[in-house]
Amino acid sequence: MKRIYHLFLVLLILCCTQILFAQNNVDMLFTSVSEGLAGHPSELVYLQTNKGIYETGEDLWFKAYGLDAQSFGLSDRSKTLYLQMMDAKDSVVWREKYPIENGIADGHVYMDEKLVEGNFSLEAYTRHSFFNDTTEMLAARNIKVVKNIAHDSGQAEKRKKRELRFDLFPEGGNLVAGLPSRLAFKATDGNGYPVDVEGTLYIDENPATTFKSSHDGMGLLSFTPSVGRNYRIELKDGKSYSLPEIYSQGMSFQLLKHNKEWMEFVISQTEGVPEQDVYLLGQMRGVVCCVAKGKLKNNLRIKIPAMEFPYQGIAEFTLFDGTMQPIAERLVYVHPEKRLNISIKLDKDNYVLREKATLKIKVTDDGGKPIQANLGISVFDKIYVNPADPANILTHCYLTSQIRGIIHNPAYYFNEENKDRMEAMDLLLLTQGWRRYVWRFGRSPYHGGIFLTDEISGTQTVKSKKKSKETQSTEQLIQVSGAEGKSAFVWADSTGCFKVGTNMMKEIRGGYVYLKPMLSKEFKPKLEIIDYFPLIDSIRKNKPSCYPIMDLSQVLKQQVLDMPVVSNDSTILLDEVVVTRKARKPFRDKFMGRLDSLAQANLGSAYVCGCGYLQNYKPGYDAHPYWKPCSISADKRSKPIEGEKYYIVKFKHLGGNAFSVEDEQLVTYHGETYSEEE
């Protein structure tokens, strides 16, 4: 009986030990991911401009969104936006700081008349989005500057011809002998632009299978590799490429099926390898969403419910063996259906020049429920669209900021009209690879290097040697004043360091901020403000830009496809068309907007008096007779708003102070209109 009891006790201890060991492994995964997340920027900044092409002498208006790096909701961590614009030679042409309120900053950049035509980059940095060890420049917006839009050809710059680059990517990371494998490939022209290719896989110089790219130079081929055989790929142009190393034993990790409800993976290992525990961890943007554990002998299938991931985006699955070593990795795009649906309805179909337009905007979630959203809208001539800039908030948040390298035409993967977009997305994830997480088992957690501040920081020094001892180990007062006369005070500590907080800057905003030491002149005080822009430049110049690209030849090809169809006998086949007049090239001039404003500012034009009546709008109609003017002072007059309704009145003088009202009308105000030539 004792032996049975002892045996039962030993088995119980072993069982508990295994359970605890497995639980410790899972806890280790959670801890490692959490510690790794703490060292990375907690914010992501997205920049939106009011258009893509600008003429010199005008303003660029922008809106910057500070987003939580995990949920992509608005973040309130950073309070100051550092913004600068770089030219094609990477020289700074503009830099400024803007306040961030509730995660949003907006403002404008003046495009100087002396700017040279070309491509420029607008870059944004915040305290919690840009660290001193940031690997790539993420928060940017490429724009184009021209002297006059009428002289812009719209054609792309000629790219230098470079040797074809052909890369191979085994699914899961490695090719293992005897295990079915999928090999993704990607072909580019060396500038990052895709090249369609086709070729043949040779085994021991015998053709085994043919293949060709299916989207943007990317494709996939399947085979089972063996040790001791010679493998190579030959493209149609005759160039030959070797395959990655084939391992004699190991594991393979493949995505078998994927739909809205779940993802099914298959894990395989070489025959004869002992059975072992494996762990599959799923995370999204640094947050662990699920961990699965199983026993692997030869093959193991694991199903992961898609509902484990709360957001749309890239899910990273990492496979660990029984010793908690990462073996393979696979990226999967989940919940593409989780998106906002925005509908815009105009109050009418056609408008005359300078007529007021009313929009009704409705925003719903993927379930059709109305939700509150922070939106931006800009209206401009479509000639100012930059076809070379394919970036938008979806591509920036879900792709560009999440995977390595430069992505060509990322908007393709979010356009529901592209029926193969999810298959193309899977190819992209197989070839681009993961960007940012490094497993750190057994090492101290790393915390990223924050160096920017939201405040104005500086130091006060005393130049007088005689008086310097009097200020040692004491705090000194500094006055902070705004342009409108508002002032406040801050203290410099015993070392002379001081900060002007964001709340104080908000109270005195409206122009320049002036700082004045309160020490008398005999101390010879001097204030030095820390300028973080030079430090930003020293960091960003060593970082590659991963801004997405667009092949303009594809854009031009699409424009050609939109043109009328030409038959074999050179006649143009048209749908039913009603010709009303001879078409004319639109007249555009960079100064017209400015002239329109000047015309509307004409001092002799209509105005709204202090009582709210419209004056000088229609001959014979005045809100007040000339012998009895408005009792409210003239400085209360205001400019009428286009499209608003106002009352106008027509009076008849009966003699003395007597008068009668002959007519009263409620009219819609429309400003004076001018022809383009005027």
Predicted regions and their residues:
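Short beta-strand and strand-turn-strand segments in soluble, beta-rich domains
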Residues: H40-L44, M85-R95, Y202-N206, H215, ...
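Contiguous segments within soluble domain cores/interaction surfaces
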Residues: N24-E43, I53-E55, D59-Y98, F131-D133
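Local beta-strand/beta-hairpin segments that build beta-sheet-rich folds
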Residues: V92-R95, L138, A208-T210, V287-V291, ...
